[in-house]
Amino acid sequence: MAKEEFPGWHGTTIIGVRKGGKVVVAGDGQVSLGPTVIKGSARKVRRLSPGGYDVVCGFAGSTADAFTLLERLEAKLEATPGQLQRASVELAKDWRTDKYLQKLEAMLIVTDGSELYIITGAGDVLEPEHDIAAIGSGGNFALAAARGMMDSDKDAEAVARDAMAIASDICVYTNGNLTVETISA
């Protein structure tokens, strides 16, 4: 699967599912360098707690770039406590206009349990439809699988885990070694 097939997307899969008063963010653990799997147990889903305000973030793309963005998001959340949308928009504005940040290659899914966003380097802060956010090379596979399960009796974690299992069966840059974080509304 050539990188050009998923412009701006990178070898991983992250999904956020909101259902039943909870949001679950799950990410696989595979790190690839070209056609080689370098690591199978990376943690691409993190919990931030600036000022006691819990936020769960998942990232696809360069790890160093993602950590830079997570640090900036945490600073924005400290400056605007309890306002995830505002902090996300401020991060996206900086990311798009700052010459240093423009070079960062990553995408983020962020949630505080009630709001769920995808943040991109193009300046987008997207609130996904159908209570599902998915990014990365296997994101479309996970998104389609999760949408097919949302009307079932499965809870948010089961939907996220099952969607990730399907994505890992299809996308060679995604494995089944998951990190899962749950946050309540």
From Swiss-Prot:
Reported function: Protease subunit of a proteasome-like degradation complex believed to be a general protein degrading machinery.
Subunit structure: A double ring-shaped homohexamer of HslV is capped on each side by a ring-shaped HslU homohexamer. The assembly of the HslU/HslV complex is dependent on binding of ATP.
Top-rank lineage group of the source organism: Bacteria
Name the record gives this protein: ATP-dependent protease subunit HslV
Gene: hslV
Any Gene Ontology biological process: proteolysis involved in protein catabolic process
Subcellular location: Cytoplasm
Keywords: Allosteric enzyme, Cytoplasm, Hydrolase, Metal-binding, Protease, Sodium, Threonine protease
